[in-house]
Amino acid sequence: MQLKYKKGYLRNGFSSTAVSFKGKDTLASSWCAVKTINDAIHGQFRIDGVREHLLSTPEMNKLSHIKQLGLAHLVFPGAHHTRFEHSLGVSHVAEMMAESLGLDGLEKDTVGVAALLHDVGHGPYSHTLEHILHERGGLDHMSITEGIILGDYDVLREGEESSVPERKSVPEILENHGIDPKEVAGLIRGPDAKGSERNLLSWTEGRTNFVENDKTKAHLIHGPVDCDQIDYLLRDSHFTGVKHGIIDHRRLIMCLESHGGDISVEEGGLPALEGMLVARGLMYSAVYFHRVTRVTEVMLSRAVERSEGYIPDSFDLQRRVDAEIWQVLHEAGDFSRDMIRRLKYRQLLKVCLSRRKQDLSEEDIRLLTELASDSKKRMDLEDEIARRAGLEPGYVAIDVPNIKLLLSEPRMSQVDIRIIGDDGKTRWFREHTPLAEALRKRQVSQAVFYVMTIPGFEGKVSQISEDILFT
């Protein structure tokens, strides 16, 4: 087979090499461009074939305008990285994992594509507004991602088509490269309906299959140890400056094995696995659920909640990027405009009341869980507290952060993974270390709820909230 190379530079700044294959052509086109990515986390790596074609789609390029950590840059000044670079990194890690697991060529392409596309369903500010999409539309970003991959959801808004001439859809590109869109969508969703890991509850020894169908590829994309988590821990740690997320990912990947229909870890990789799971818990406490990060997210979400009628419906909202939703909210009324300005100039709400789980009765927990799942009841209670404190509606906010964890990171409770011993038998991670049980029980956020208000009203709002909620 002869190869011809044509070097050039892409408009997005990636260096590119086009490769022409003479001989049997298995691709949609005889020309296959190779992009060399210079990444802050993984260094230099290449993207080619179907993944290179996907990089030119609106679905992928939209992610360049959505911050990975939402408003966390107001707490961690370096956290301006985007979903786009994260997706590139996840695809690279998936390639490394696929190589270690011994997957064949088509399997590598399939998991590489699933990794690259795993976040295309995200809307503005990533997880910050996801609960609104879930409440109003019954969907999450993974459902939107599935729709994009299967051709059931278009990220372009009305009138934008003319700016993207000769566009090919995601499923069309996949099919042209011999990849099944349904398989890709299934890998991203996870092995069960909600990405849960039901098959991990079984246990056996040796090489008997753990599950009826091989879940190796599915868990590479969405499982207790997957390419998404490895990249976001490393990337978010780097850009926030919080070192808890630094993990020995190369050692961990080297010790992965497809064993009995699932991903297992060789015993020599146990310290690296322990390090990753501990890092995940610490990063959620120190970064993702940092108290001030939560304040900024609550301020933005309340601005959206109280602008219904002025902003797009939940499905159209997902088509926007960060800057667009900011502009929409600025024009959506006095309250939303004030929240946006407060975020712009970092004049944030203040936490005036919080509680740890051990300080709450069963009745208290029931009430807070109800408030977290019923936004109307929560808003009515917030407005009653505000009224008694002499504030306008919206200037008191109640936040139950652990409920948000169910939408943003359903894998947090998945800490049990099979370890392959030198005798060839598999044993649970929990049989090797007490860390498994400790991590499963560990609370991400020490406070299970917060009450926030504008500066100067903390004492009054705290007392009124205490009286209403706990007496």
Positions of predicted regions on the chain:
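Sequence-structural signature of the catalytic-core scaffold of metal-dependent phosphohydrolases
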Residues: Q2-I66, L74-V113, G121-R355
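Terminal helices and disordered tails flanking the catalytic cores of nucleotide-processing hydrolases
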Residues: Y9, S301, I311-T471
